[in-house]
Amino acid sequence: MTERMKAVAAAGAVAAFWLAVWVFAAVLVAQPLILPGPGAVALALLRLVCDGGTWAILVGSGARILGGLALAAVCGGVLAGISSRLRAFARLVAPALSFVKATPVACVVVLLLIWLGSARVSIAAVFLMALPGVYFSLAEGLAQVNKPLEQMFRLHGVRGWRLFCAHTWREVLPFVLSCARAVIGMSWKAGVAAELIGMAVGTVGERIYQAKLLIETADLLAWTVLVVAASWACERVLVWLLRVSGPVAWRAAVRAHGHGLRGRAGAASDGAAAELALAVGDRAPWAPALDGLVLNVPAGGRICVMGASGMGKSTLLSLAAGECAPCSMVFQDARLVEGSSALDNVLVCADARVDASNATTLLRRLVPGIDVHVRVAELSGGQRRRVEIARALLCGGCAVILDEPFTGLDAAARDATAEAVLDLLDGRTLLLATHDVVDAQALDISDIITL
């Protein structure tokens, strides 16, 4: 028996157990008005399903509930986005939403009935009940976005909607999925409760109230089954759509690579080299070796920064990158989208003139025998390093900045990689940080700054 068959059998056994409990309880009570048996409820459910009016009512209530949920998602996303940038705004909004979150649904519905009337009460109730859950989940997700990876994307010219698709949405998506599983079911409960309390005409809540007045317990349970089924179906569909949205957003960002590359501080938008002048001043007080340092790199020049660990080499390169962004950079720490392929990691930051064929050729030159479609998480440290170098070489911008680029490579791999860097530098400025003079020699750099 397969695992799937075992799971189905286990679920069937659980359902049979609770059905038996229901039958036993109904027989024990012996009063259909209090607890009808499964047969009576099944007949009532069949009658409702065969009635076309039932579906119109269910669809109408569902549309209002989903409308309130969609409004909460939009407003919660906007509020969370603002809160992630402005701490004062977050401190202002959080108490109000925490209060709404703790308020009983009945109290909210009664207030909404006074303010809005019964026609719009379900939409407003769902909105208010879902908004805190959406906001706090998105705020937490945005607070935990991988900042170093975001820095890498921005530096390589991936901004705006492409940054959102390639990075932000993928980082926040697990929090959104967790929120959706909790909020969708709660929204159906809040919406139906609002309809019931407000006695809105032509709604599921009204039908449940009528069943209660007429003591039609079987109909009441049948409507409950329909609401639970509708809530379950909505949750499954929406969660599936959210899961699919992650890969779809990533593919959109990869296909649109090279869009929006614009430099500043003299950086040429066409990728031509530009002069780099950097006065560190007091911008790096934690690195005394950089105090007062002035870095001047002529257009197309090559400079190596050497020094012991902790002297500020990486800090200097980061400051330089900020002056000429967008440019390409290999960071000292690995910055890759682990769940995506080596090819996509290169293409997402690549110049618009680069296609999959160019990227594949370079990857296979740097990493002989590589499967470019394999996830980078499955590659060795040296292979991952060369994927980052390929990404840097195929990115637009006016400079290539390499921070300890040959870490994890043997001498042969280092020399082959350095040769590829020189072949594809294309006149751009090259800035290298290393502790090994051999790296500078491999890249034909004679101008060395020692910290």
Per-range role (PLM):
Residues R375-L379, Q383:
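Conserved ABC ATPase signature
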Residues A356-D371:
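Conserved ABC ATPase "signature" region
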Residues R375, E404-P405:
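Walker B catalytic motif
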Residues D403, D410:
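ABC-family nucleotide-binding domains
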Residues I389:
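Hydrophobic anchor residue at the start of the ABC signature
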Residues D333, G339-A352:
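Q-loop/switch helix immediately C-terminal to the Walker
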Residues A124-L128, W161-A194, V227:
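Transmembrane alpha-helices
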